[in-house]
Structure formats: structure tokens, C-alpha cells
Amino acid sequence: MVLLKEKPRTIGTDSDNSIYKDIEQSITPPSDKNEIFIDQINNDRITEYDSHGEVKRDLKARHVAMIGIGSTIGTGLFISTGHLLSQTGPVMSLISFLFVTTICFSVTQSLGEMATYIPVSGSFVQFITRWVSKSCGAANGWLYGWSWAITFGLELSIVGQVIQFWTDAIPLAAWISIFFVLLTALNLFPVKFYGEIEFWMASIKLTAVIGWIIYAFCMVCGAGKTGPVGFRYWRNGYAWGDGMIVSNNGKYAIAFINGLINAVFTFQGTELVAITAGEASPKALKSAIRKVMFRILVFYVLCMLFIGLLVPYNDPKLTEDGGFTRNSPFLIAMENSGTKVLPHIFNAVIVTTIISAGNSTVYAGSRIFYGLAESGVAPKIFLSTTKAGVPYVAVLFTAAFGALGYLVVSNDGTVVFNWLLNIAATAGLVAWGFISVSHIRFMQVLKQRGISRDTLPFKAFFMPYSAYYAAIVVFTVALIQGFTVFWDFNATDFFTAYVSLIVFVVWWIMFHFFFFGFGKQAWKWSNVLIPLEECDIDTGVRDINDIEFDVPPPKNLWQKFWLIIA
């Protein structure tokens, strides 16, 4: 979604303005009938309409800021990091996070450069459609929406197990049903309810993570019952996990590759911040990109560092049965340090995180499918909306994938979680890879037309090398992350590892013939990959430097801290 600013109106209270004005931008009419645009900014809210006059989104500025933060703190951080630690040890877990951080940096940089030059709706899917091929763009859109829908099933699959930290009197199926109905119903309300819920949940998550980092630092320094921990669990081979201890580097390399999938799932959603900043001024966008990296380093890398310091990789609680919360390294660190009350409080935070993540996945997936229907590559019934502007058919379609959560009732919860995580993470990898490919093509078109990147509103760092690096690494990981299934072939493991790639290729081929038929047009290379001279980098271009921006400096230390975080 693109946020814009209209002068001289303001959004919210004076306090809101001083904190959030960096996300307000100028109004630009749509470049075509399918674009979503800002119709008016008034009454302390941002109201977004599409060309049908049916879909309506009302989000206050404070909602948008906190949703941006909340997207960086999800279930992957609190749950899947334990699996990563047990597989690879603390050092390689940290290296995995730093490795994926470099990919996220490249992806957000690429999106920033493209989205500021051509601030169109539809995010990166439009860029793929313009500069790679129409069929590739449509396939990416479907895969991206599908990954959000799959993630909804993943969230439902673990919510009951997390609650079982307190009691197992109520069966898993009952908890899944309760939250299945609740989260689906919430997304059928006007979007202002979604914004309000996400605002408060993101506030809780932000406070909890910052508090846990402070707590972990104190425990490492000796505040816990075990005294100073320091690097105790990095000595005597503990730093490298079982692979290095048994001198089996092949096993260790496999564990590291598999661990990358966990890291990728944890990081997914960070690209949404760059998309939201698509029509920011150059100064505002640079700030937004810096904040993405700051959030990653604080909320992910720093948390992973302290997890590795406080929890040994071979702690039996990381892999024992009894529910995902009991496997969470955050809670294990608290229990090992002798803090009796905090695990219960933090478990409530994890429940809040799952509810927030499930709510967001249905919202994001439904809007993606709605946009695909507008573009003519999804059933038109997805355009059906309520009087309040909610695309209820797209919401119900996305939410239907929540039924996958019931798989935990008849299967091991960890196995089901890893199935869905792998499918969603691989789909996310494909999206990241084609964002980088789109940027490479974009830079090639600029060079062919003699347009210097120095004239762009925002120039990404380390390009084009960073984009090539991200594309090569992402596609390589996506291809090799399941190669172990060929040593001892298992149909279930093969399906889990590669179904996203298979589905993407099938959709790509299907849409190619949908657009070009089965005649000679279908076999022209120019329809497989758009020639540089035919790539459209003109539609939707706007000189953002001509717009005046009034971003007041923060007035106190709290506002300075808030602007860094939010």
C-alpha cells in the first residue's frame, strides 16, 4: 500500500504529526484504471479507494507506522529460531541471520530504487510484469498471495500448542477452530478495525522484544541464578553444533542450508516496508531503508546473539515434545536463568504475535488476490466487496487455507510446522529473487536509454553487484535446500521442499499460454523475456524532487528514539 501526503492538511494530533509525518506524502492520481490511489486525507485518517469505488481502506497514520514495525516481529522469530539453533549451533545460527540480512538489504535497496522512480500500486509484481514478462509477473503474484495464505494455516497450526503451555484441557482442534473463525471474522470488518488491532499488538511485540533484549543482557552479565554466562555455550565445540563436533562437515553444511530456510521465514515481510515507502521523498526513503536494517539488526540479529549465549544448542527442551512454546529459545532462556514469572508473560506475548501474524496474513493475501483479479489474472469474483469496502470473497478464499492448521491434530505438530514453513519460505525466496531480477533489468533499461542512476530519486547501494548477488544466492538456496531428499527419497519430503517451485513453474507456463495462446506468438523469445527496448519505464514516472516535504525534527529524546524505531 502506498501512503501519500497532501499539503497543507495534517493527519492526527500534533503529537501524531511530530512522530509520523515522515510517512505522509503527496497525492498523485492513478496512471491507469487499475491503480489504487489516495482520494482524500481528512478526519485523522488515510482513506484509499480503487477505481471501482468499492474497496476502501481507512488507516490512521499511527496504524501504518506500527504495522511497519510489527511486520518485522513475527512467529518465525519466537518459534523457528529454536529449531535453527538446535540444527546449527549458536555461531552458525548467527551467521545464518547475518547472511540473510545481506539478502534483505539488497532486496529492500532494489525495491527502494524502483518504487521511488515509478511509484505504482501493485508493488513488485508490476515491475516483474513490465521488465521480465507478463506471465512471470502473474505467476509471482499468485505465488506471493499463496505464500501468505499458507502462512495463515501455519499460524493456526501452532496457536493451540502455544496455549498448551498453560493447559492441555482443551483439544488442539478446538483452539484452531476458535482462532480460525475469529481471525476470519476480523478481516470481514472494515479495515480500520484491522489497523487498530495491529497497532496495539505491534506495540506489545515491540515492548516485549526490547524488554527481552535488556533482560538477556543482564542475564549474560550475571543477574541470573547461574551467574555470568558470557560465552559459556560457545566453548568446547558448542559454538558449531553437532556437525563440527563429530567432524562431519557434510552434515554440518546440510544443517546450515536447512537453517537458512528457517532464517528466511523469520525475515519474510521485511520487504513490505520498502514497498510502503514507495512514494517517499529521497530523504524519507533513505531513512526508511536505514530503519529496515536497524530493525533487522536489533530485532533479529541481536536476539539471535543473546539466544545463542543463553541457550546451549543441545538443550533438550529445544527439541522435546510438548508444544512449540516449550521449544521457544526465548522462554528456555528465561527458565534456565531462574526467572519463574516471565515465561508465562512472554508466552502471552507469543500468543499475541500469532494472532497478529494470522490477522496480517489474511489481510495481505486477500488484497493480493483482489489486485490479481483487477489485473485480469484471477477470477473476477475476487473483486466482490461489502458496503464497507472489504473484498470478502478474497478474504474467505485466503482464510480457507487456514484449514491446513488441522493437520497437527493427526500429525506431529513439529512436522506440520516444518512442512508449511518450508513451503511458505521457498515461495518467499522466489519473490525475493525476482525482485532482484527486476532491478537488474531496470538498470539495464536505464543504461540502454542513457539515463544515469545518479538522477534517480533514490540510488541503491552496491548495485548492480548486490542485485546479482541476491538473485544468485536466493535461487541457489531455493534449488538446493531440499537436495537431501534424493539421497533417501521420500515423497513427503520432496513435496515439502519443492512444491512451491513446481507450482510457480506450472503457473508461469499456464499464464504464458493464457496471454499468448498456443500459436507462433507463444514461442517468440520476446514474449518469454521482454526486450530491453520494449520495457516500460515511463508509465507512472513522477519527479518526486519537485514535491515539498515538511518533516519537522523530533522535539525530545523520546521522539528521536521513536523515529529511529518507527
Curated annotation (Swiss-Prot):
It is a multi-pass membrane protein. Gene3D superfamilies: Amino acid/polyamine transporter I. Disulfide bonds: none annotated. It comes from the Eukaryota. It is found in: Cell membrane. PANTHER family: AMINO ACID PERMEASE (PTHR43341), ARGININE PERMEASE CAN1-RELATED (PTHR43341:SF4). Probable permease for arginine and lysine. This is Probable lysine/arginine permease CAN3. It comes from Candida albicans (strain SC5314 / ATCC MYA-2876) (Yeast). The lineage of its organism: Eukaryota, Fungi, Dikarya, Ascomycota, Saccharomycotina.
